[in-house]
Amino acid sequence: MPSSSAVLCCLVFLAGVAASRDASTLSDSSCTHFPASLPHMLRDVRAAFGKVKTFFQMKDQLNSMLLTQSLLDDFKGYLGCQALSEMIQFYLEEVMPQAENHGPDIKEHVNSLGEKLKTLRLRLRRCHRFLPCENKSKAVEQVKRVFNMLQERGVYKAMSEFDIFINYIESYMTTKM
């Protein structure tokens, strides 16, 4: 679960933007520049993941993949928007809170990674053409089912494959630009 101070900060920010007379101009402007800023945002997410990647990949002792080709196919297909939205929510609400329980250093880095993912989600939501959806993805449901079956090992598996998730985000976004 996101910390209450982070949620409060986001709500105050969003209220300020909504109250602004130029809110739609700001949103349109940021959406115009979003495709150009996406590589930088993904680079930041990758760098944040790099700080915990080795830890989680060393702990992941499973030979199977959690993030499968069917998920990438959903990202590239008509369910891409929903698959992306659900996977961001899955990592923020299910994976990362459990991943933070592996010591203060890991918690700090996972928290930073989560904040960068939240920022990306916020930008995607502001630019409706990138995230205008509500249908459920069967591939995401499969990822969640396997994650839950793996119990504690699911955290290691999901976090060790976070770089694959970043690549899937990039693949989805390139189809939308």
Curated annotation (Swiss-Prot):
Q: Where is the signal peptide?
A: 1-19
- Lineage, top-rank taxon, reads Eukaryota
Intrachain disulfide bonds: 31-127, 81-133
* Sequence intervals crossing the membrane: none
Gene Ontology MF: a single term:
cytokine activity
Localization (cell): Secreted
Location (main, coarse)? secreted
GO terms for cellular component: extracellular region; extracellular space
Q: How does it assemble?
A: Homodimer. Interacts with IL10RA and IL10RB.
Q: What is this protein called?
A: Interleukin-10
Q: Which organism's genome codes for this protein? A: Ovis aries
Q: Which gene carries the instructions for this protein?
A: IL10
